[in-house]
Amino acid sequence: MSNNTKYIFLSPHLDDAIFSCGDYISKLTSEGEIVLVITIFSGYPLSQQLQPSAKQFHKLCNLGKYPIEERKKEDRLACERLQCDFRHLSYYEYLYRKDRNGNFLYRHIYSELKNEDTLKNDIIKELLMHLDDKCVVYCPLSLGDHVDHVFVNSIGRALEFMRYKVIYYEDFPCVSDSSMVSYMGKTK
């Protein structure tokens, strides 16, 4: 039964934590533990023009004009099935984020992380509303170098610096066996 620990999984996008840690989340909830999945980047810019890479991504994934609502519905259903709670934060993923001048910050998935301290601080403030001294935070390792996963990993490191217990998970499918081997320095 529950030991009053709350397990919080930070998910860069809808389905990332479920896809990567669903079996463990299921184990925790079946044992009566409190689990909360917080998706950081689940906002969608309804009024802005999309950059070419976003249009290409939408077409490749056969996403409609406003894909986020269907994806949120799928995520809610997955969380219900796993018997965990969820929060969808309204921040934009890399495809939609712009700088102060209205220019897109990132052109592709593996872009170098920009200085987005204001965004990072806003997200941390929102996360702190869900954290206490008994929680365990699970955060992506970001081994696949997806810019949003790297960003959320930096949030995990900031929470760790603030003395929260943070455990890092392999963010599947961003990491594959070959990228893990390469990351570990064991390439041929």
Descriptions of predicted regions:
Residues 1-151, 158:
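Active-site beta-strand->loop->alpha-helix modules in alpha/beta enzyme cores, enriched
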Residues 161-186:
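Short, flexible loop segments at boundaries between secondary-structure elements
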